Amino acid sequence: MRKWFRSFYSSGLFIPFILLLPYMCTIALNGADKALLLHSPGVEDMVPLMLMVQMKGDYAEEAVKAQAVIARSEVYRRLEEGESEGEILDEVSESIAGKNRERRVEQMTAATEDEEVLSFRIAELNSGRSFVVRYGGVWKLLSAVDKLQQYGAAAEVTAGQVLTYNGKLKLVPYHEISSGKTRDGTEVFHSAEYGYLKSVESSQDREAPGYVNSAYVPASQLPAKLVVKKRDSAGYVTALTADGNWLEGETFRQGMHLASADFSVQKVGKMVRFLCKGKGHGLGFSQYGGNEMAKKGSSWEEILETYFPEMEVEVVMEMGR
């Protein structure tokens, strides 16, 4: 028994077990619903989970911190617009469940009473974080120690900090790789309301793996004549015609599942090739560009100042807490 205990203790499982013991006792005595209600989620609890959805691959610490501020800003903005924490967690949980394979998330599920209320508890562990999510009437114990440890630390260091424009929470977009220059909000949305999203240079993105992507589509499946009509100052297509019918560039990009709206069109035999630069919509924070800045010594504050020069970092208190 002593030998088993020493092995259990040295394995690193002892501390997580002790930390979860009160929670397990609460479930045994009062039921799982009571336990989860006693540990309802807060904005800071959501941030590491949102990072699991928003970030792909490995990123430097300062880049993750920058994304943490963006994620937190998104939560507070959505809460301010009337969404509930449960609705946001519902969406995040569903996204995590859909991406658990690529993110190497281990899941253990067990059926429970079907309720519409989504409850949540997150517990800090010595080797990272694990969390219990109730989604669609099922309890899920998820753990992705390597990532959640990094994401949890980024959330803690930047706790309470959000991006604002003139003291107000605004849309703070991000994308994986720009075409070498991020887009201007006014040009994309055709509204001065988004003028705080300025186009900035992100030339390091041109060196990113996957910067250039080709998509081939049978010509028979496309309109006979596709013509790019307008591009914005960053090179992204804003308008094109399909057999004379006008289409919006980003809408076309999403409908065709193209990597980016900075594309050219070329006929190749019986196929049409779309040659795309960058990945994503190109607005706001370039994750690749920010990561390259972080690797060269830039802080998360400097990264955000670069990609959001019109915005400021402010500290907020958790709403309703």
Describe the function of each predicted region:
Residues 1-321:
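Conserved, single-site charged/polar hotspot
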